Amino acid sequence: MKIGIVGCGFVGATAAYAMVMRGVGRKLVMVDVNRARARAEAADISHAVPFAHALEVIAGEYEELEGASVVLVAAGVGQKPGETRLQLLERNAAIFKEVIPQVLRHAGDAVLLVASNPVDVLTHLAASIAGELGIPSSRVVGSGTTLDTARFRSLLSSSLGIDPRHVHAYVLGEHGDSEVLGWSTVTVGGMPLDAFAHRKGASFPPGLIASIDHQVRHAAYEIISGKQATYYGIGSALANIVEVMVYDRRSILTVCTPLPEVEGVENVTIALPHLVGGRGVLETFPPALDHMEREALRNSARIVRNAIESINV
């Protein structure tokens, strides 16, 4: 199976490397406006193939995306220290208006996976462009809060001393400052968080809850402050999403895709738990949040909707 990657910066290249390590697909086609960068990244990653899985990794043009089942779009400028994801919008929206039509011209049957930030708004923009070509919005998916959700689960598991794969917790809304940690819906081993913590002799006092919230919400800023970019975590998250799509795993992931309504906010793209498979988003499962979380999710949806309107989508 062919997978396209458009944008060979830190995120796109790291996602490609993660796919090789996981053995996702059979062929990776890397496309970038900087052709020398695409060739160099493809060559470097291909040298890891003998130590991992037998994938063909090449640099190419948009034409070579034809027949791809998934195209990862990681094109755009990066987030600067102190810059919010929404502040990136104007610059990256202009890039998307050039890139997305070229991708769809050659890979119109593919699922688009958007990674560029602000991912919620750019996914909405990509879906709008795709819609003009008759492509359903369910086949345009953003990485959403998949990485934030992983951070949340990891911190909870550390506090409980268990494997994070057995913690079911979700971060919802914008992938950014207004995201919502769904504390009221957390379960561990089939039990509500408080009940499981009590059995373990642990607790989540307000101070610990606030600390976890801060760490999840501000992780990217702290990483960017120290090394100018984030890419290992999101690269791994993207490789996982692509694997789910390529092999039709039918996994519940907090990706983002255009939704008709969220908490009274219409026509908005934010992260909720979605059933994801070979043709993109198959179904949406809004969680049963408490009152404060619902208000926070409504606020997050409004923020993203306002950003969408700012680029006239």
From Swiss-Prot:
Activity modulation notes: Allosterically activated by fructose 1,6-bisphosphate (FBP).
Binding site for substrate: Q79, R85, N117, P118, V119, D120, D148, T149, A150, R151, T230
Residues the record lists as binding NAD(+): V11, D32, R37, Y62, G76, V77, A115, S116, N117, S143
Pfam families: Ldh_1_C (PF02866), Ldh_1_N (PF00056)
Alphabetized PROSITE patterns for the sequence: L_LDH (PS00064)
GO cellular component, one term: cytoplasm
Domain of life: Bacteria
Catalytic residues (positions): H175
Subcellular location: Cytoplasm
SUPFAM superfamilies xref list: LDH C-terminal domain-like (SSF56327), NAD(P)-binding Rossmann-fold domains (SSF51735)
GO MF annotations in UniProt: L-lactate dehydrogenase activity
InterPro entries xref list: L-lactate/malate_DH, L-lactate_DH, L-lactate_DH_AS, Lactate/malate_DH_C, Lactate/malate_DH_N, Lactate_DH/Glyco_Ohase_4_C, NAD(P)-bd_dom_sf
Any GO BP: glycolytic process
Signal sequence segment: none
Catalytically driven reaction(s): (S)-lactate + NAD(+) = pyruvate + NADH + H(+)
Keyword terms, alphabetized: Allosteric enzyme, Cytoplasm, NAD, Oxidoreductase, Phosphoprotein
Residues holding beta-D-fructose 1,6-bisphosphate: R153, H168
Pathway: Fermentation; pyruvate fermentation to lactate; (S)-lactate from pyruvate: step 1/1
UniProt EC number: 1.1.1.27
Phosphotyrosine modification, residue list: Y221
Family, similarity comment: Belongs to the LDH/MDH superfamily. LDH family.
Subunit structure: Homotetramer.
HAMAP family assigned: Lactate_dehydrog
Entries under PANTHER family matching the protein: L-2-HYDROXYCARBOXYLATE DEHYDROGENASE (NAD(P)(+)), L-LACTATE DEHYDROGENASE
Function, in words: Catalyzes the conversion of lactate to pyruvate.
Protein name: L-lactate dehydrogenase
Organism per entry: Geotalea daltonii (strain DSM 22248 / JCM 15807 / FRC-32) (Geobacter daltonii)
Gene that this polypeptide is encoded by: ldh
